[in-house]
Amino acid sequence: MPLNAAMVGTSAEPVVHTIDARWLMAYAAGLGETLPCYLDTRRPEGLQAHPLFPVCVEWLAVLGMRDHAGAFGLTAEEALRTVHATHDLVLHRGVRPGDTLTTRATVVGVEQRKPGAFQWCALRC
């Protein structure tokens, strides 16, 4: 599966999400969380998102990068066989109900590795 270095700098269309309490609670419950900060809407401080919740708003941006695969030499079948190998998440503040987040995915690097091609995408919210 070849990756063309010309794809560096390519960005997917921005994805906009409005965060609501129900989504935050559903995510936390899906992880088996029981802490009130993730589930109790009556808390004076309100709900907070689980620290891994941002993957929810990143995923559609990642999928949006597949729309560019053909322009850089990947077939649709190859694009579907890609593997998410690693994830580095930096939170500058917690996500709260009512937040509107815009996520942008941009290819920031490609290289050949023993198992195949490797691509880095930066996801910014």
Can you say where each PLM-predicted feature lies in the sequence?
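Hot-dog-fold acyl-thioester-processing enzymes
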Residues: 1-84
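Hydrophobic beta-sheet segments that form the core/acyl-binding groove
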Residues: 82-125
